[in-house]
């Protein structure tokens, strides 16, 4: 007896519906995609009981003709593609011809539409079967009314969450569409009450409108970049904002929300120097890519994408974010918003003050990108730590720890690196502050402008050295004996092979001497004694970007050269560190940790009930 048989057509449709429609928010996503693809400039959304009871969408798009309305709910019917070639350059949100048929199978659906504005037609479908088709009064656009969701899918309906949770999922879908289509007016109604309106606006304003309350001062930086077939727009939070989860890293490709591990890593790597371990950035990435270079047909809900011939994409994202935090913030577009909350914390008023905002650096101190060497009599010299009166204890520490003395000496010597000339003291005055002292042999206490700073001596010295290294002149150094190393992972091997020429630009010469085998032949002079750091980078290349190679190297060198916890510092050297600290634009160590803690006079008075 035969065991394999053809499935009933209706059963096949129910199986297909179960793949793409798993809860009310899936229905909402598909209906919104159709409205957006129709060219609508206004979309009204009505949800009842989290979409479980009812989902109603009204748009002013191009509409559906009488003939198309009769077949639009049938499987594999679509107006968006007609050939295999169209799959290679998808420009619409929908394209499979499965959404309406899947919705019609698992619910009751009514569609009323007009293409002329003079007359409209309505079709009613229950369980995938047409029940009624009739003429209706004229409307402009389309109305889709979905009710009794999963009434014929009892197992699926049992697994739905409570109304507040389903509502939250629907609002998340709405957020994705609202943020990526600022040219559309959206009106949101929950349980027959108007909850929020988004008016047509720029992408900058829309991002501020939707995500502005994520950062306390409501200020985003906008980074724009164009490269060949790619347009990149990134909204970045200030360096001192981070989260304990990845929830506020969002990526959009051609206006689709995408969950892509590589994009997430590129964003995280770009922030690596300003984030401490366990923290994640607040970042919203928008990519516009020629459809011929991407494939969205890889996930049932189109949450993933494949990129073709774009090997540089992730590096481009990471490098630009990394460079953003290295440059003066004046070069970027500042946006300020003012949020006015109603009783239900939903309606938001936007004020874009970008053109009137007086753009200034975060810290009102002069820049200094040159290392101040021992030749300057006003700077600490080789023996500065031993000169402080009364620090006899430290004299013995220096004698017992020659490495510390050597490290401090090397930082200010020409034998360590070739540095630019120090600034003229007549041209650049020291920053005014009151140095109070050192505590726990770890922190420097400083008073400045009615605020007290507790500065991590190791972290700040590490950061100072790191910045000098990045801006120093470097020379190539050929190794007497090349160092051989092996790359076992085939994917990493391909990456290394493709980047050998880029390494040369960094004065790092490696050559392939066999399958999986390489040798390191030349390195920059500052990398002397740090060859193992280079090798480790190559062997873990999969999850890191080239720009992080320089950062990792300099961070390692700076960490080893900097003063350590438990080192007692002279007043002179402490003041030097503090002066340099206030010149730093980004006050994080190269590994992402914060350098300091600050408390104002007012905050301190509040703690002791004086304010």
Curated annotation (Swiss-Prot):
Gene3D superfamilies in UniProt: 3.30.230.10, Histidine kinase-like ATPase, C-terminal domain, MutL, C-terminal domain, dimerisation subdomain, MutL, C-terminal domain, regulatory subdomain
* Organism in which the protein naturally occurs: Borreliella afzelii (strain PKo)
Q: Which GO terms describe its cellular component?
A: mismatch repair complex
User: Which GO molecular function entries does the Swiss-Prot or TrEMBL record give?
Assistant: ATP binding; ATP hydrolysis activity; ATP-dependent DNA damage sensor activity; mismatched DNA binding
The GO biological-process annotations, alphabetized, read as: mismatch repair
Q: What Pfam families would the database entry show?
A: DNA_mis_repair (PF01119), HATPase_c_3 (PF13589), MutL_C (PF08676)
What domain of life?
A: Bacteria
Reply yes or no: does the keyword DNA damage apply.
yes
Q: Which UniProt keywords apply?
A: DNA damage, DNA repair
- Family membership, please give it: Belongs to the DNA mismatch repair MutL/HexB family.
Recorded hits in SUPFAM superfamilies, A to Z, give: ATPase domain of HSP90 chaperone/DNA topoisomerase II/histidine kinase, DNA mismatch repair protein MutL, Ribosomal protein S5 domain 2-like
- Protein name, please? DNA mismatch repair protein MutL
Its function, per the record, reads:
This protein is involved in the repair of mismatches in DNA. It is required for dam-dependent methyl-directed DNA mismatch repair. May act as a 'molecular matchmaker', a protein that promotes the formation of a stable complex between two or more DNA-binding proteins in an ATP-dependent manner without itself being part of a final effector complex.
Q: Which InterPro entries match?
A: DNA_mismatch_repair_CS (IPR014762), DNA_mismatch_repair_MutL (IPR020667), DNA_mismatch_S5_2-like (IPR013507), HATPase_C_sf (IPR036890), MutL/Mlh/PMS (IPR002099), MutL/Mlh/Pms-like (IPR038973), MutL_C (IPR014790), MutL_C_dimsub (IPR042120)
């Amino acid at each position: 007896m035969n065991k394999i048989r053809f499935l009933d057509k209706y059963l096949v449709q129910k199986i297909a519906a179960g793949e793409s429609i798993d809860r009310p928010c899936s229905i909402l996503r598909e209906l919104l995609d159709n409205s957006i693809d129709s060219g609508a400039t206004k979309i009204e959304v009505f949800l009842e009981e989290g979409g479980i009871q009812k989902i109603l969408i009204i748009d002013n798009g191009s509409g559906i003709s009488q003939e198309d309305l009769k077949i639009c709910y049938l499987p594999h019917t679509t107006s968006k593609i007609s050939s295999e070639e169209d799959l290679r350059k998808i420009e619409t949100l929908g394209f499979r011809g499965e959404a309406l048929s899947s919705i019609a199978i698992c619910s009751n659906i009514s569609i009323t539409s007009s293409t002329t504005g003079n007359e409209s037609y309505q079709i009613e479908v229950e369980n995938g079967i047409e029940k009624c088709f009739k003429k209706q009064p004229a409307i402009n656009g389309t109305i889709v009314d979905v009710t009794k969701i999963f009434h014929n899918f009892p197992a699926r309906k049992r697994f739905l969450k409570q109304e507040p949770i389903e509502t939250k999922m629907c609002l998340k879908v709405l957020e994705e569409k609202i943020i990526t289509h600022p040219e559309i007016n959206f009106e949101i109604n929950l349980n027959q009450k108007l909850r929020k309106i988004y008016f047509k606006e720029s992408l900058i304003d829309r991002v501020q409108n939707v995500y502005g309350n994520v950062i306390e001062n409501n200020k985003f930086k906008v980074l724009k970049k164009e490269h060949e077939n790619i347009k990149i727009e990134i909204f970045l939070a200030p360096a001192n904002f981070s989260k304990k989860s990845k929830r506020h890293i969002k990526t959009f490709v051609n206006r689709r929300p995408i969950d892509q591990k590589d994009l997430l890593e590129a964003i995280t790597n770009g922030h690596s120097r300003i984030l401490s371990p366990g923290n994640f950035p607040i970042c919203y990435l928008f990519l516009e890519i020629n459809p011929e270079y991407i494939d969205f047909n890889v996930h049932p809900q189109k949450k993933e994408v494949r990129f073709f011939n774009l090997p540089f994409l992730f590096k481009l994202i990471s490098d630009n974010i990394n460079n953003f935090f290295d440059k003066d913030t004046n070069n970027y577009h500042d946006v300020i918003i003012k949020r006015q909350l109603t009783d239900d914390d939903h309606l938001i008023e936007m004020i874009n003050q970008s053109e009137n905002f007086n753009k200034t650096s975060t810290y009102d101190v002069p820049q200094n990108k040159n290392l101040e060497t021992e030749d300057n009599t006003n700077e600490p010299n080789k023996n500065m730590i031993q000169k402080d009166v009364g620090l006899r204890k430290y004299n013995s520490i220096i004698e017992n720890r020659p490495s510390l003395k050597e490290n401090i000496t090397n930082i200010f010597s020409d034998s360590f690196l070739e540095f630019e000339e120090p600034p003229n003291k007549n041209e650049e005055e020291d920053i005014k502050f009151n140095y109070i002292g050192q505590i726990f042999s770890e922190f420097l206490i400083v008073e400045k402008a009615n605020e007290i700073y507790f500065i991590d001596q190791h972290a700040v010295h590490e950061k100072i050295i790191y910045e000098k290294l990045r801006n120093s002149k470097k020379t190539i150094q050929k190794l007497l004996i090349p160092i051989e190393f092996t790359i076992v992972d085939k994917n990493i091997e391909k990456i290394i092979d493709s980047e050998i020429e880029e390494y040369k630009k960094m004065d790092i010469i490696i050559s392939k001497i066999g399958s999986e085998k390489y040798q390191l032949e030349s390195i920059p002079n500052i990398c002397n004694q740090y060859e193992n750091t280079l090798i480790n980078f190559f062997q873990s290349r999969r999850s890191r970007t080239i720009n992080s190679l320089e950062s990792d190297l300099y961070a390692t060198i700076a960490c080893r050269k900097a003063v350590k916890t438990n080192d007692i510092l002279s007043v002179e050297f402490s003041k030097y560190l503090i002066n340099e600290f206030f010149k730093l634009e980004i006050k994080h160590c190269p590994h992402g940790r914060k350098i300091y803690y600050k408390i104002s006079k007012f905050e301190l008075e509040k703690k002791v009930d004086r304010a």
